[in-house]
Structure formats: structure tokens, C-alpha cells
Amino acid sequence: MKQVFGVFGDPIAHSLSPAMHNAAFSALGMDCIYHAFRVKPEKLEKAILGAEAMGFGGLNLTVPLKETALKLDCIKPDPLAEKIGAVNTIVFGETGEIKGYNTDGLGAKQALQNSAVEMEGSKIVVTGAGGAARSIAFQLAADGAEITIVNRTEGRAIELAKDISAASLSGNVTGKGLSGLKNLLQDANILINTTTLGMHPNVDTAIATAEDLHPDLTVFDIVYNPLETRLLREAKASGAKTVSGVLMLVYQGAEAFKLWTGIEPPVELMKKTVLEALQV
């Protein structure tokens, strides 16, 4: 019998995770299958316990379940997931323990590293202060990065920066309002956009234009629909290096795969599968 893995969320119909993980299982000759399941927050604990009872191999969680999962008594979060305040990967232990992890920030970090972006000593600007910004900023702060979080509502950026600072991580984190973005970018090495600006169908919007950017900057947009956002086009026009949001999706999935199976997945195949799905 195939071992089942899955992703819980609501909505979930357009998830690319099943195609990505099933391609990896098939390539490795593993008798496993990955499905998407629509689960509402109030049913999450029952769904997780049901998956455990049925012998699922592991789970991913997506919107709007990541924060809900951390509050469940049945899940033991790892220290970083607890600090972030969100879980996106569930591992069922052999002793009955259900462990929660957050691979989003690690996925973003690896997307940058595997695009030959120099991280050490870099000044990083993160736009947005939602769940994705939180995961990424916590991960990079744990690695000692200098980060400025910029958000339209300055108070949210400052609050997130305080949360990260209170976690006693080695990085230096501050929060600013959107009006200061242009000046911050002049001294920045990396810009990470975690807002939905530029996402389909609002494809003509961007957090910054070419005149705000420069050739010594790396611009990473976690939006991957469309594949090339307006921000990435503006970055190319300025001479900046660009990193696609597809890579974060793939690498966070690859980290989850390793947590479940202990096996290194075929990352290039996973990336190819996602790109093909997005181009249909």
C-alpha cells in the first residue's frame, strides 16, 4: 500500500505541492503519493490526528493553518517554529510524537545561497510584515543577518522587529515605514519582497521601480505567479541580480521532504515540475 503524504489548507485546489512531491517520489522509486486536502482551521487538530491514525508519512500546512497549528496541544514545535509562531511541516514520529517545523525561511535562505548570492555581511531589506516575512526574517536573523523590515503600516514592521530581537538571535533587525524604502535600498545588498504586489491578477504592481534599484543589489521576489513579476523586470532593467520565488517554493518543499524521509530529493526535477505546472 502506498504511503500517503499531503498538504492541508483552504483554499487548496491550486497547490503546486502535489505535482512537485509526486515527481520526487516517482523519480526515487518510492511507493508514496502526495495529495492536497481542504481543511478549515477549526478542523485542523482532528485532521492531523486522523492523518496520524491512518499512517500518513507527513504533512505540509499552508494558508490559513500555519499559525493555528502552533496552538494545538498535539503538536510539539521545534524551537525556530515556536519563535516564528507558525508551522508548515508536520512529522509523525515513531513514538507517537507529532513534531512541527517551519521550512519557509530555510527555503528562502537556500534559494539565495543556491543562486550564488553572498549572504555574509549583507544588508537585507524585507518588504512586508506578514507570515512569510516573519519566517524569512527569523531564519536570516538566526544566521546573523542585518535586516530592515519595511511595511506600509510601520507599526507592524516595528512589532515584528521587536519580536525577532526578543528571541535573542544573533542578527540585527529594525522596522521602518514604506516611505523610507528608497533610501534604504541605496545601501542594501539584498531586497526580499514578501508582499503580494505583482501577484496575478495585479501583475502591473511592484514594490519598487528600476530607478530605486542598483546593479550591486540582489532582488528576490517570493511571488511566483507570474514567473517574472514586474519587480523582477524592474530589477533586470536596473542591472540588479534576480531570484525567482519558485526557488523558495521548491527548497522549502525539499526541506520538508528530507524531514519526512531522511532522503535528499531531486531538487532540479522538483523545480522543473513546478515551472511546467506554472506555464500550463
From Swiss-Prot:
Establish whether keyword Signal is in the entry.
no
Which InterPro entries did the record assign? Aminoacid_DH-like_N_sf, NAD(P)-bd_dom_sf, SDH_C, Shikimate_DH, Shikimate_DH-bd_N, Shikimate_DH_fam, Shikm_DH/Glu-tRNA_Rdtase
Residues that coordinate or bind NADP(+):
128-132, 151-156, 222, 245
Name the positions where shikimate binds: 15-17, 62, 88, 104, 224
Identify the enzyme class.
Answer: oxidoreductase
Active site per the UniProt annotation: 66
Oligomeric state and interaction partners are given as: Homodimer.
Q: PANTHER family of this UniProt entry?
A: BIFUNCTIONAL 3-DEHYDROQUINATE DEHYDRATASE_SHIKIMATE DEHYDROGENASE, CHLOROPLASTIC, SHIKIMATE DEHYDROGENASE
Function of this protein? Involved in the biosynthesis of the chorismate, which leads to the biosynthesis of aromatic amino acids. Catalyzes the reversible NADPH linked reduction of 3-dehydroshikimate (DHSA) to yield shikimate (SA).
The entry's protein name is Shikimate dehydrogenase (NADP(+))
